[in-house]
């Protein structure tokens, strides 16, 4: 499975109205930090690949809106930030040409390349599988 198309990292996005209600918590916090309402949810599938410069660009953008990160970032608790949605929404708004976007409401999902779960839902459902995998190693 290639993670790039035409030299651009593949990023998935799904319209918010199609997202499970448990994940809607990420919309408001993403909107709060970015200052615009993202049309899509971007925490769709691992791995997520971003050019290194986006971290600096996003930091500058956030600090222009909220002040130095060292003053507020450590105070964020619980479900008050989704770094994957911040990165995705920022990339989609300000550097869309640097990615190959897949709108999951219009295109099929690419094949999985890693096993992933949802940590906020707990690990009980995955524990038996992990125990079996670790026992084999």
PLM feature spans:
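A glycosyltransferase accessory/donor-loop signature
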Residues: 62-137
């Amino acid at each position: 499975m290639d993670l790039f198309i035409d030299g651009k990292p593949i990023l998935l996005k799904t319209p918010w109205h199609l997202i499970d209600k448990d994940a809607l918590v990420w919309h408001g916090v993403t909107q709060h930090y970015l200052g615009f309402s993202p049309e899509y949810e971007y925490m769709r599938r691992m791995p997520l690949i971003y050019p290194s410069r986006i971290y600096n660009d996003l930091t500058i953008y956030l600090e222009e809106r909220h002040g130095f990160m060292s003053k507020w970032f450590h105070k964020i608790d619980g479900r008050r930030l989704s770094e994957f949605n911040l990165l995705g929404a920022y990339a989609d708004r300000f550097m869309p040409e640097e990615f190959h976007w897949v709108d999951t409401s219009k295109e099929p999902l690419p094949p999985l390349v890693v096993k992933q779960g949802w940590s906020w839902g707990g690990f009980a459902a995955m524990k038996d599988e992990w125990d079996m995998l670790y026992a084999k190693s």
